[in-house]
A protein has these predicted regions:
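Non-catalytic C-terminal interaction segments of nucleic acid-processing enzymes
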Residues: 101, 105-152
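Conserved catalytic cores of phosphodiester-cleaving nucleases, focusing on short active-site segments
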Residues: 29, 48-50, 55-65
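A structural signal for short, well-ordered beta-strand segments and their strand-loop junctions
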Residues: 38-39, 106
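Acidic-basic catalytic patches of nuclease active cores, encompassing PD-(D/E)XK
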Residues: 2-37
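Conserved functional hotspots at enzyme active or ligand-binding sites that engage polyanionic ligands
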Residues: 28-30, 57, 73-88, 123, ...
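Short acidic/glycine-enriched loop/turn segments that link adjacent beta-strands
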Residues: 42-45
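Catalytic cores of nucleic-acid endonucleases
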Residues: 62-104, 109
């Protein structure tokens, strides 16, 4: 089998980055005293599931990067050949890991842009408030508390 070196290296680094993000989100959810289920195999449309005992949440894990004072992540999937696909109906929340600041955020899929989502780390220069998502509002610890009960 012939493998192009450049594509192979890119694919491996993408897989490793995704694995690191999944491990970080899993760790953060467990530290927040939540029960976390890990689906078996790669055929599942989500990466993790949180079970509170009262409801379940399908979690799609994303690795973010910081650009222009914002935590930025792709809020769509690519199904190689079919283009961009929304996660609506396939996941309930994004578990977003930012390796640059080593933090995890939980962002609802509903209401997220269908291509790229940005969470601001700092206030806007023009003091705009409408439509601005601040990263601090999506901390994993706050989301866990908002569920009403931790599954400890």
């Amino acid at each position: 089998m012939f493998v192009r070196a450049g594509r192979y290296v890119h694919r491996v680094s993408t897989i490793l980055r995704g694995n690191a993000a999944e491990a970080a989100v899993l760790n953060a959810l467990i530290r927040a005293d939540l029960f976390v289920l890990v689906p078996f195999g790669d055929g599942c449309p989500y990466d993790l599931m949180v079970d509170t005992g009262l409801e379940t949440f399908k979690v799609q894990v994303k690795c973010a990067r910081i650009r222009d004072h914002c935590i930025t992540f792709n809020s769509c999937g690519t199904d190689h050949g079919r283009g961009r696909e929304s996660y609506e109906g396939r996941a309930d929340v994004f578990g977003v890991y930012s390796p640059q600041i080593d933090r995890v955020f939980i962002v609802p899929v509903d209401g997220s842009p269908h291509f790229q989502t940005r969470l601001r780390c700092t206030p806007t220069r023009n003091n705009q408030q409408r439509g601005v998502r601040y990263a601090g509002d999506y901390a994993v610890e706050d989301w866990a508390r908002s569920l009403g009960r931790a599954a400890a």
